[in-house]
């Protein structure tokens, strides 16, 4: 499987609850490479663009209000199959349906405060990475243990 990138965001509830290290650690232990990281409080414009697919849904305003309510940790992770694997690490959108061992299964109980966002497809990842990061904010590097992470 070819290396790909995904966008992951720790939402304001995850930041406020002190879960940044726990979540970062899960991605690092899995073997993915962090290529972009920043903390910011998103503007309404950024939030509306990010959640644009939900613009006509009744919960859109609540999503925008929540994601702009405090700091978010925005990240770009890279690795073989990272998009699908990250979705498995994150767990179901509704935390009460998320499996134990997943981020949401272990750390969240309410859909409106589900701690983390992850891109769901390559096209979404590309859009979200471009929305949240400038190309100059992403690092292209090779971990010293790369040979121990993947074959070939």
UniProtKB/Swiss-Prot annotation:
It catalyses: dZDP + ATP = dZTP + ADP; a 2'-deoxyribonucleoside 5'-diphosphate + ATP = a 2'-deoxyribonucleoside 5'-triphosphate + ADP; a ribonucleoside 5'-diphosphate + ATP = a ribonucleoside 5'-triphosphate + ADP. Its EC number is 2.7.4.6. The active site is at residue 117. It is an enzyme of class 2 (transferase). Its main location: cytoplasm. ATP binds at residues 11, 59, 87, 93, 104, 114. GO terms for molecular function: ATP binding; metal ion binding; nucleoside diphosphate kinase activity. Its cofactor is Mg(2+). It is found in: Cytoplasm. One of its GO terms (cellular component) is cytoplasm. Pathway: Purine metabolism. One of its GO terms (biological process) is UTP biosynthetic process. PROSITE patterns: NDPK, NDPK_LIKE. Keywords: ATP-binding, Cytoplasm, Kinase, Magnesium, Metal-binding, Nucleotide metabolism, Nucleotide-binding, Phosphoprotein, Transferase. InterPro entries: NDK-like_dom, NDK-like_dom_sf, Nucleoside_diP_kinase, Nucleoside_diP_kinase_AS. The keyword Repressor does not apply. CDD domains: NDPk_I. Belongs to the NDK family. Major role in the synthesis of nucleoside triphosphates other than ATP. The ATP gamma phosphate is transferred to the NDP beta phosphate via a ping-pong mechanism, using a phosphorylated active-site intermediate. (Microbial infection) Catalyzes the phosphorylation of dZDP to dZTP, when the bacterium is infected by a phage that produces the substrate for the synthesis of dZTP (2- amino-2'-deoxyadenosine 5'-triphosphate), which is then used by the phage as a DNA polymerase substrate. Homotetramer. PANTHER family: NUCLEOSIDE DIPHOSPHATE KINASE. This is Nucleoside diphosphate kinase. It comes from Synechococcus sp. (strain WH7803). The lineage of its organism: Bacteria, Bacillati, Cyanobacteriota, Cyanophyceae, Synechococcales.
């Amino acid at each position: 499987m070819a290396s790909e990138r995904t966008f992951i965001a720790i939402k304001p509830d995850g930041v406020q609850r002190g879960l940044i290290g726990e979540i970062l650690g899960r991605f690092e232990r899995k073997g993915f490479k962090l290529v972009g990281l920043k903390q910011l409080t998103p503007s309404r414009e950024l939030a509306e663009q990010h959640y644009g697919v939900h613009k006509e849904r009744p919960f859109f305003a609540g999503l925008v209000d929540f994601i702009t309510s405090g700091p978010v940790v925005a990240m770009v992770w890279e690795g073989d199959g990272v998009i699908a694997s990250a979705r498995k690490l994150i767990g179901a959108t509704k935390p009460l349906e998320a499996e134990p061992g997943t981020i949401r299964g272990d750390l969240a109980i309410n859909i409106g405060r589900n701690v983390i966002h992850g891109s769901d497809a390559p096209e979404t990842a590309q859009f979200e990475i471009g929305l949240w990061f400038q190309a100059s904010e992403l690092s292209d590097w090779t971990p010293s243990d790369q040979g121990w992470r993947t074959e070939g």
